[in-house]
C-alpha cells in the first residue's frame, strides 16, 4: 500500500508539474525534475544520504520475462546488489512498475528513493532501463540521496552514425559504443554499411560484394584513395577490410536491443556505389565502361539487385526504418546513358533529379510492402519526395525544415553542428581529420527546433543525430577520441528540455564522464586539456583599414559563394578567423585566380605594416599561396611594389596558419594585396588584411 501511494504521489507531481526543476550535477542527460526528499500525503521527509550499497530485493510488475532479464542485467551493470523476488519486499526493495500512461512519455520514468527502498515507474521497459542508467550515474558519483527524479526525453530519435565502410570496425568495438550510447539514453545506431570504400554486410545473393568489394589495398582510406581506389579479392596479398557476417549482424542487433537501441542499416543508393559497380560492372551506365559512382537507374537489373539485397537486410534488421542513402549522386552519367534516357522517356521524367526521385519512390514502395519505411539524406527531396519518406537533414537545416513543412518526419543532423569528423580542439593538437573545427560547445549549442518554427511543423522533427565519418580515422582509439564526448552533447540535446540545458554545467558533467571513460579503457577526447579556439579570433582587431572599402579585381572578385563570409566587407571587418574555414570569417577563393584586391584608405596614410593570414588544410584541399605581392599607390593608378613574399607549399597532414606581410614605412591611399595560388588546385582562404 505504501509503494502504491508513493507512486501515485509521484505521478501526480509529474503530471501537474510542481516546481521541481533543480538540476542534478551527477546525471547526464540532465533530467526534467529532481527533488530532494519525499512527501507522502501531508508528511514530508527531507533529503538524506541513501545506502545504495545495500542488497536489494528486485521485483517487477507489468514486465515480461525478456525485459525483466534485461532490466536485471542493467541493475547489476549499474553497480547494484540485487536478488530477484516474486513479491515486493517491505524494506530494501527495488521495485519496477511498468504500465501504459503512467508517465509523461513512453520512454520516461520516475524514481522515488526513500530509506525503505527504490520505486521505479515507467510506461515501457525502455523507460525503466533509462531509470537504471540514471541510478548507475548516482552510484558512480557516490552521492545518492532520498528524493524524486522524474524524467522523459524531448525527442523520440536520439542517434549516432558510425561509419564502418571507410574503415571497418569489429563487433566488439561496436558493442563498446552501444554500451556508452545506452548510458547516455540514446536509442538509434545508424550503421553506414556501404560506400565506395567498402561493402560491409554479408549478402548471399550477391557474394562478390563481400569477396571483392569489401577488400582493398592499402588499408588506410587516404592511401587507398590516393593510389587509385583499388579493390582486391579476399585473401589476396595485402588485402585489408572486412564485413559483418549475417550471424555477427544479428548478434549486434540483439546486443543493441538488450539496451533498447535500434540499429538502422544504411544501404547507399543510387550514389556512393563505386564498390557495387566494380563488383558487378553490368550495372554501370551503358556508355561508360570506366569507374562510376551512380547505379544505372535505366537497367531493371539494378532494381532486382537492390530489392534482393534489401530482402536480406530486413531479414537481419527489425528496425522500422531502412536508410537508403540518396546523397551526393553525381547524376552526370545518367544524362548520356541510353538506358537512363529510355527510362526517362517511358516514365515522363523531365530531368535526372526526377530520375533519382523515380528510384527512391520505387524503393520506398517496395520497402513499404515489406512493412518498413525509408529514411534518406536530404537530397531525396530533389525531384519530388516519396510520400512516406523520412528525411535526414545534413547539408544544413533548410532541407529538414522544408520536409517538415510538407508533413514529412525529419531527423536533424546538420553538418555545422553534428558532423563530428572535424577536429574538436586546436587542429594542430589533434590527429589528422577532414578539416574544420567543431568544439563541444558548438555541438551543444544546436537547437533542432527553432523558436520561429510553428508548433505544428516542429512536431515533425523526430530528433537529432551525430554523424562520424571515418575517412581519416584508421584506429579504433582515434574513432572513440572523435566520438566522445561530442556524442554526449547530442544525447543531451535529444533528451533534455531546452530550459534545463546550460553549457557550463554540462561541461563540468562531461569532464567527469570522460574521466570515468578513460578509467574504463575508452579513449575519449580529454576535455580537461582543451586548448580552445584560435586566440586571434577571440576579439576584433582594430587597425587602419578596418571598415574601408575593398575592391575585388578579376578574377578574385568571384570568391566562392559558399565561403563568401561577410562578402565584400570580409577582409576589413576586424574579425580574424577561427580554426575552421566554415566560420563565416575566412573568405575562400577557388578557380584560376587567387586573391587580388585593392583597399581604399580614403586618404593618404602613413603605413608601417600590411599583413594577412592564410590557412592550409590539405585534406579538404586548402593550401597556402606560393607568392604574395603587396603594392601601394597614392592615386590608385600608379602602384609601387613594396613586397614579394615567396612560399614553398608543402603537403603535410596537420593544419597550419601563416601570416604573409610587409613591415617598413610608406605613404599611400591605396593598397593592393595579391596572393597567387600554388600548383596545387584547391582553395585559398584569407581572413583579414591588417594595416597598421
Show which residues each predicted segment covers.
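Flexible, acidic glycine-rich loops studded with aromatic residues
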Residues: 374-379, 384-389, 395-540
Amino acid at each position: 500500500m505504501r509503494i502504491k501511494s508513493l507512486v501515485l504521489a509521484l505521478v501526480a507531481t509529474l503530471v501537474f508539474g510542481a516546481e521541481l526543476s533543480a538540476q542534478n550535477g551527477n546525471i547526464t542527460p540532465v533530467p526534467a525534475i529532481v527533488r530532494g526528499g519525499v512527501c507522502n500525503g501531508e508528511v514530508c521527509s527531507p533529503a538524506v544520504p541513501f545506502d545504495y550499497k545495500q542488497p536489494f530485493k528486485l521485483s517487477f510488475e507489468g514486465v515480461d520475462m525478456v525485459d525483466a532479464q534485461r532490466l536485471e542485467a542493467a541493475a547489476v551493470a549499474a553497480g547494484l546488489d540485487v536478488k530477484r523476488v516474486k513479491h515486493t519486499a517491505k524494506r530494501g526493495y527495488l521495485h519496477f512498475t511498468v504500465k501504459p500512461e503512467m508517465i509523461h512519455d513512453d520512454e520516461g520514468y520516475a524514481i522515488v528513493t526513500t530509506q525503505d527502498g527504490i520505486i521505479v515507474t515507467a510506461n515501457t521497459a525502455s523507460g525503466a532501463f533509462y531509470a537504471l542508467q540514471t541510478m548507475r550515474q548516482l552510484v558512480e558519483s557516490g552521492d545518492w540521496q532520498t528524493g524524486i527524479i522524474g524524467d522523459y526525453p524531448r525527442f523520440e530519435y536520439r542517434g549516432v552514425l558510425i561509419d564502418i565502410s571507410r574503415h571497418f570496425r569489429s563487433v566488439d568495438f561496436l558493442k563498446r559504443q552501444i554500451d556508452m550510447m545506452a548510458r547516455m539514453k540514446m536509442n538509434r545506431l545508424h550503421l553506414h554499411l556501404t560506400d565506395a570504400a567498402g561493402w560491409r554486410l554479408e549478402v548471399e545473393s550477391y557474394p562478390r560484394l563481400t569477396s571483392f568489394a569489401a577488400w582493398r589495398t592499402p588499408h588506410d582510406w587516404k592511401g587507398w584513395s590516393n593510389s587509385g581506389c583499388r579493390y582486391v579479392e579476399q585473401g589476396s596479398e595485402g588485402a585489408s577490410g572486412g564485413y559483418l557476417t549475417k550471424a555477427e549482424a544479428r548478434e549486434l542487433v540483439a546486443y543493441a536491443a538488450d539496451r533498447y537501441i535500434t540499429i538502422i542499416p544504411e544501404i547507399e543508393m543510387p550514389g556512393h556505389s563505386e564498390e557495387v559497380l566494380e563488383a558487378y560492372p553490368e550495372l554501370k551506365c551503358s556508355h561508360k565502361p570506366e569507374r562510376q559512382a551512380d547505379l544505372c537507374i535505366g537497367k531493371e537489373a539494378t532494381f532486382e539487385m537492390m530489392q534482393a539485397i534489401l530482402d536480406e537486410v530486413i531479414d537481419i534488421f527489425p528496425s522500422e526504418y531502412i536508410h537508403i542513402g540518396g546523397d551526393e549522386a553525381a547524376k552526370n552519367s545518367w544524362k548520356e546513358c541510353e538506358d537512363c534516357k529510355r527510362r526517362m522517356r517511358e516514365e515522363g521524367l523531365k530531368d535526372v533529379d526526377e530520375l533519382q526521385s523515380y528510384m527512391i519512390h520505387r524503393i520506398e514502395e517496395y520497402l513499404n510492402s515489406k512493412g518498413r519505411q525509408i529514411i534518406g539524406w536530404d537530397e531525396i527531396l530533389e525531384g519530388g519526395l516519396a510520400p512516406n519518406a523520412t528525411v535526414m537533414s545534413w547539408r544544413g537545416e533548410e532541407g529538414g525544415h522544408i520536409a517538415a513543412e510538407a508533413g514529412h518526419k525529419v531527423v536533424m543532423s546538420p553538418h555545422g553542428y553534428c558532423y563530428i569528423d572535424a577536429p574538436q580542439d586546436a587542429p594542430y593538437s589533434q590527429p589528422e581529420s577532414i578539416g574544420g573545427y567543431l568544439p563541444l560547445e558548438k555541438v551543444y549549442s544546436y537547437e533542432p527546433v527553432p523558436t520561429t518554427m510553428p508548433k505544428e511543423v516542429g512536431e515533425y522533427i523526430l530528433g537529432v543525430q551525430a554523424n562520424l565519418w571515418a575517412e581519416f580515422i584508421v584506429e579504433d582509439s582515434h574513432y572513440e577520441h572523435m566520438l566522445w564526448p561530442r556524442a554526449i552533447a547530442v544525447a543531451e540535446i535529444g533528451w533534455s528540455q531546452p530550459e534545463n540545458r546550460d553549457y557550463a554545467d554540462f561541461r563540468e558533467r562531461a569532464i567527469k564522464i570522460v574521466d570515468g571513460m578513460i578509467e574504463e579503457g575508452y579513449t575519449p577526447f580529454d576535455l580537461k586539456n582543451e586548448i580552445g579556439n584560435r586566440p586571434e579570433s577571440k576579439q576584433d582587431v582594430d587597425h587602419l583599414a578596418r571598415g574601408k572599402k575593398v575592391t575585388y579585381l578579376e578574377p578574385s572578385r568571384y570568391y566562392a559563394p559558399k565561403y563568401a563570409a561577410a562578402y565584400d566587407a570580409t577582409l576589413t571587418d576586424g574579425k580574424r578567423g577561427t580554426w575552421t574555414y566554415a566560420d563565416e570569417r575566412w573568405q575562400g577563393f577557388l578557380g584560376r585566380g587567387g586573391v587580388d584586391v585593392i583597399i581604399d584608405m580614403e586618404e593618404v596614410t602613413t603605413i608601417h605594416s600590411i599583413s594577412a593570414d592564410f590557412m592550409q588544410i590539405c585534406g579538404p584541399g586548402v593550401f597556402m599561396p606560393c607568392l604574395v605581392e603587396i603594392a601601394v599607390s597614392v592615386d590608385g593608378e600608379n602602384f609601387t611594389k613594396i613586397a614579394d613574399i615567396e612560399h614553398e607549399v608543402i603537403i603535410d597532414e596537420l593544419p597550419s596558419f601563416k601570416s604573409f606581410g610587409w613591415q617598413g614605412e610608406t605613404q599611400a591611399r591605396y593598397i593592393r594585396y595579391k596572393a597567387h595560388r600554388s600548383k596545387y588546385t584547391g582553395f585559398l582562404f584569407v581572413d583579414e588584411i591588417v594595416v597598421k
